[in-house]
Amino acid sequence: MSFAEKITGLLARPNQQDPIGPEQPWYLKYGSRLLGIVAAFFAILFGLWNVFSIITLSVSCLVAGIIQMVAGFVVMLLEAPCCFVCFEQVNVIADKVDSKPLYFRAGLYITMAIPPIILCFGLASLFGSGLIFGTGVVYGMMALGKKASAEDMRAAAQQTFGGNTPAQTNDRAGIVNNAQPFSFTGAVGTDSNV
């Protein structure tokens, strides 16, 4: 068993279907899950640090810390439901979110990461919520899919749409059809010489 197979076996859930699809490389599928787990851990840790800022009477940092801890728990619930074995419905919730498109998860993570940074801008909220934001960005990139091959992009660029002529590539091709060349011999007939 190779190292990659061991890592994928550790990160895969029992009876997991492969919701992301075969077009994604294994390191992107499991790397995003690992990044989400690490992000959730640090979000909870630094959210607790922000909650302790109540000592300095900073209520906005207290609220930001609570939101950041909740976001960390939600990300941990969705990425590693094995951490919440004491709750019965965790696998149902995680499977329901796994069945949704990847852009749903990306939007959820990005949306959850922004309020703590706005409420209490500091290293703790920036790092904890920033990792969750980064996880959302990775899922968003996975939702976009991989880039088409060069042949497909060339074919799409050369297609005509709605009777339009393909782009001309010679030096005499102008932006406006039937444009007359500039004449420097005199003023244009409609010019008022003003």
UniProtKB/Swiss-Prot annotation:
Where exactly is the site Calcium ion selectivity?
E79
> SMART domains in the record, alphabetically?
Cg6151-P
Please name the GO terms that the record assigns under molecular function: calcium channel activity; identical protein binding
Cite the entry's keywords alphabetically. Answer: Calcium, Calcium channel, Calcium transport, Cell membrane, Cell projection, Cytoplasmic vesicle, Endocytosis, Endosome, Ion channel, Ion transport, Membrane, Synapse, Transmembrane, Transmembrane helix, Transport
**Domain of life according to the entry:** Eukaryota
Q: How is the protein's activity regulated, according to its record?
A: Channel activity is inhibited by La(3+), which reduces Ca(2+) influx and thus inhibits it's function in promoting activity-dependent bulk endocytosis (ADBE) in response to high stimuli.
One of the record's GO cellular component terms: cell projection
Location in the cell: Cytoplasmic vesicle, Secretory vesicle, Synaptic vesicle membrane; Presynaptic cell membrane; Endosome
- TM ranges are 35-55, 66-88, 113-133
GO biological process terms, alphabetically, are: bulk synaptic vesicle endocytosis; cell competition in a multicellular organism; clathrin-dependent synaptic vesicle endocytosis; photoreceptor cell differentiation; positive regulation of neuron apoptotic process; positive regulation of presynaptic cytosolic calcium concentration; synaptic vesicle endocytosis
> How does the UniProt record describe the way this protein sits in the membrane?
Multi-pass membrane protein
Spell out the subunit comment: Homomultimer. Associates with the dally/ magu complex.
Q: What family name appears in the similarity comment?
A: Belongs to the calcium channel flower family.
State what this protein does: Transmembrane protein which mediates synaptic endocytosis, fitness-based cell culling, neuronal culling, morphogen gradient scaling, and calcium transport. Regulates synaptic endocytosis and hence couples exo- with endocytosis. Controls two major modes of synaptic vesicle (SV) endocytosis in the synaptic boutons of neuromuscular junctions (NMJs); Ca(2+) channel-independent Clathrin-mediated endocytosis (CME) in response to mild stimulation, and Ca(2+) channel-dependent activity-dependent bulk endocytosis (ADBE) in response to strong stimulation.
**Protein name (record):** Calcium channel flower
- Give the organism, scientific name: Drosophila yakuba
